[in-house]
Amino acid sequence: GDVYKRQGQLNLPSYGNVMPNPKKSEIASRIVRGEVGGIFNIFGVDAIRQLQEVAVKESRLGIPIIVGADICNGYKTVFPIPLGLSCSWKPENIEEVARISAKEVGADGICWTYSPMVDISHDARWGRVKEGAGEDPFLGGIMAQAWVRGYQGNDLSADTTLMACVKHYALYGAAEAGRDYNTVDMSRVTAMNYYMRPYQAAVEAGVGSIMTSFNEFESIPATGNTWLLNDVLRKQWGFNGFVVSDFTAIAEMVNHGIGNSQAVGVKALKAGVDMDMIADCYHAVLKKSLEEGKITEAEIDSACRRILIAKYQLGLFHDPYKYCNPKRAAKEFLSVNNVSAARR
């Protein structure tokens, strides 16, 4: 029944290049079947508009897709890396970078960015230090809020703003020996005092979405960690946006020894992960899990509802093609104003 259509909103596949004929692509046929809530890393208004037309005109429910992309330090106009920007001690610089990025990205068909990365790290061996604001939780919190304000502005439904997605929740920068994806082992006291502030700051600034991290905390992967995703994020901090997994993170819980793909899909949904990035684990296991009573219809509904609310906030139900105006790209990309801001 309809619950399976609602489950389709929880899937975030990515198919890279869909040109020259997006409407004949594999992703288009999945959209028609109602299996896709969003896509990411597909660029350009032509391709995105065609896939959005498929969603609105050819799928049974006509629900528009949300389109995401990894934006770090600018889009067409390139700015200093986030670590460099944070060293300016000027949150207004970061806010301006995010505002300009939002205009350029929004002009290319995209409405959701996987930024900012606010992970605190004390280990220079970790390869992603450059994307954050360094070691200090207070500074990290200030800069996290500047990114969110710059991307989201005052009106998420404007075509010059993006929904931000704070990442990687949580403690991704504290991997043992700086090895990416490695285990994180620390007390809750250390976590809360030294690492968690920037995520909380982003929530206070009204960030629309949050991405889980690959690492374990207290030997439970963050993507299936109820204490992180429910007790702290939703209950303590009052986050009411939606949660997306990192790239294939749900399926990777199998490698963490949590169980088979059905077990990890159930664990992620119950912990509070609303959207499955590229693993297609939810797509593969939730129908069966519902039939077997391992999850409830209400759990699928609450995840679906959060994703639909985000699409509504972005104005996609009002105008699914609002980010797909081909004339805007020429005006926004590398404008004199943008380039002079970058040179400053």
Predicted segments — roles?
Residues 1-344:
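Glycoside hydrolase catalytic-domain context in secreted enzymes
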